[in-house]
Curated annotation (Swiss-Prot):
Keyword check for Coiled coil: no
GO molecular function: rRNA binding; structural constituent of ribosome
Primary gene name: rplT
GO annotation terms (biological process): ribosomal large subunit assembly; translation
Pfam families referenced in this protein's UniProt entry, alphabetically: Ribosomal_L20
Record-linked InterPro entries: Ribosomal_bL20, RIBOSOMAL_L20_CS, Ribosomal_protein_bL20_C
Stated name of the protein: Large ribosomal subunit protein bL20
Gene3D superfamilies hit by this protein: 6.10.160.10, Ribosomal protein L20
Family statement: Belongs to the bacterial ribosomal protein bL20 family.
Amino acid sequence: MARVKRGVIARKRHNKVLKQAKGYYGARKKIFRVAKQAVIKAGQYAYRDRRNKKRQFRRLWIARINAAARLNGMTYSRFISGLNKAGVEVDRKVLSDIAVHDAAAFSAIVEKAKAALA
C-alpha cells in the first residue's frame, strides 16, 4: 500500500483554522492547537448569543413601550391587555419603534387601549 503524506492537507486545515482565529490575542491567533480551541469556543458563544439576541431585543422593546406607556399614564401590562381587548394586532417591535419616533401616534394607540379597558 502506498504511503500517504498529509503535509499539504494538514497545512490547509491548519491555515483554515488560523484564518478563522484572525484578530484573536496572543497564542490564540498563532498556535494551531490553541487557535482551534478558541475557534470552537467562539462558535459556541455565537450559537448561544444568536438565540440570546432575540430575548435581549424583546426586553429592550418592552422597556421602551413601558416607558412610553407610563408617560401616557398607563403601565405596560395594562397597555398590552387593552390592545388585546381592542383587537389591535401590532407587535412589540413596531410599538417600540412608534414609541421612540412618533409620540403622537403612540398616544393615540394608548387612548385606544384605555377605551377598550373602560
